[in-house]
Amino acid sequence: MNNVPWLSVLWLVPLAGAVLIILLPPGRRRLAKWAGMVVSVLTLAVSIVVAAEFKPSAEPYQFVEKHSWIPAFGAGYTLGVDGIAVVLVLLTTVLIPLLLVAGWNDATDADDLSPASGRYPQRPAPPRLRSSGGERTRGVHAYVALTLAIESMVLMSVIALDVLLFYVFFEAMLIPMYFLIGGFGQGAGRSRAAVKFLLYNLFGGLIMLAAVIGLYVVTAQYDSGTFDFREIVAGVAAGRYGADPAVFKALFLGFMFAFAIKAPLWPFHRWLPDAAVESTPATAVLMMAVMDKVGTFGMLRYCLQLFPDPSTYFRPLIVTLAIIGVIYGAIVAIGQTDMMRLIAYTSISHFGFIIAGIFVMTTQGQSGSTLYMLNHGLSTAAVFLIAGFLIARRGSRSIADYGGVQKVAPILAGTFMVSAMATVSLPGLAPFISEFLVLLGTFSRYWLAAAFGVTALVLSAVYMLWLYQRVMTGPVAEGNERIGDLVGREMIVVAPLIALLLVLGVYPKPVLDIINPAVENTMTTIGQHDPAPSVAHPVPAVGASRTAEGPHP
């Protein structure tokens, strides 16, 4: 088994599956759906093999594959995973089959839907799903293929150990997501939201491209030019690149700008609420729980390890923006009347926690952030999909149109309650441990930032309990009598998510055992260590730290 290129298999299986599904005859819609399921489950099986064979205590990067790609520019086809990448690979491959099941009818004509399917017709089928003669075209094929293509590109972004290779797939995933939002979205503003998503992220990508080229120029000036991530990190640590510190700060900002848009970090978040609301629930989860994690992953791997000194310099500013995002997302969520928009703003708050944990540069903060990426993916998937199932039955996103749902759909209401409590980090559910670690790590470095972060916990309880009370409790509102409970297909989606939230809430040790060695390697690479616990704060000696921080905002 050691001779099998598992990482190449991992990303090529969904990509090949996407191509084959597009080539299926137009009328074979059911075959396209089932083929997508088979491909996604096969990809999950490969990821389980990778996770099972991964040894956290061994070398930092495992399953390494290295082949020449563009030798003239020092670019190679280099793959490998550390513990952080393994966790994100598992998150991606677990969610994709569930999202395909959840979106089983997302590309289906409205006349084919019925209450028994768990989705009520809300609007006529878009013209693009029909030919001029009324015969169905490849709408289902495209939907499944685009989802698998995004899975492939996200996986490649996580396992790439070449900066140029990472960049290519980091940008390429925007195209299938654009078509999923604009081509299959359910809102009237889906086209505008898709364009907004694409323009924001493309602009960030262009800035990052300049930084990628600049990084290569630096390596070529002081050494043999390369895009190999590990070689560049080793060169930075050894001081082989003697460029002006201002150059490295500019390169850091180029990478950070693209990742801040993708993640998203306040105030670069404005594309997210519209894109999430106008998409189908499954596409919104694919975007927020899977694709956007590449942004926070990029901060943890590329920003910190390629540019340790600039990361330390800009640390106070980034942590400040992250905490502002935490509070901003929570406050704006409280004022929403649209259920899906409210949930979308909660993700902005959660991403603020993740980014703060990364940039406080403590072991607890970074372990908590990595675990938070996993837990946020699961909790967001659960709450967004269950809300989507409810909206599909009622045909309205307005919170005011609901009430008494728990009396007509008790299972739906119960699972929504569990996922909502996971979103507010209730003890006993998965996000609690990760949020606790992030706050603990932040407090040891910036106690005031942690104190403001704690206020967001109170605000999150306010907006989620208010949402549950308005939607699920009280008398049954007019028009809600026909709302049915979760059907079998929907339970297949919800049950694993709820189970994982419960299991990881009481026993996160197996995941932390994979994450912690990778975090320790990152801390060693960037020359950081946890602050010594003390009450007093003596002035550090000159030269005591690796580099100075920038001015505290």
UniProtKB/Swiss-Prot annotation:
Subcellular location: Cell membrane
Main enzyme class: translocase
EC code: 7.1.1.-
Example GO biological process: aerobic respiration
Keyword Cell membrane: yes
Span list, region Disordered: 113-135, 527-553
Topology in membrane: Multi-pass membrane protein
Regions of compositional bias (Low complexity) in chain numbering: 531-544
Reactions catalysed, as given in the entry: a quinone + NADH + 5 H(+)(in) = a quinol + NAD(+) + 4 H(+)(out)
Keyword line: Cell membrane, Membrane, NAD, Quinone, Translocase, Transmembrane, Transmembrane helix
GO molecular function: NADH dehydrogenase (ubiquinone) activity; ubiquinone binding
GO cellular component assignments: plasma membrane; respiratory chain complex I
Ranges annotated as spanning the membrane: 4-24, 34-54, 84-104, 140-160, 164-184, 197-217, 246-266, 316-336, 342-362, 371-391, 420-440, 447-467, 492-512
Family under the similarity heading: Belongs to the complex I subunit 4 family.
Its biological purpose: NDH-1 shuttles electrons from NADH, via FMN and iron-sulfur (Fe-S) centers, to quinones in the respiratory chain. The immediate electron acceptor for the enzyme in this species is believed to be menaquinone. Couples the redox reaction to proton translocation (for every two electrons transferred, four hydrogen ions are translocated across the cytoplasmic membrane), and thus conserves the redox energy in a proton gradient.
Protein name: NADH-quinone oxidoreductase subunit M
Name of the gene this protein is made from: nuoM
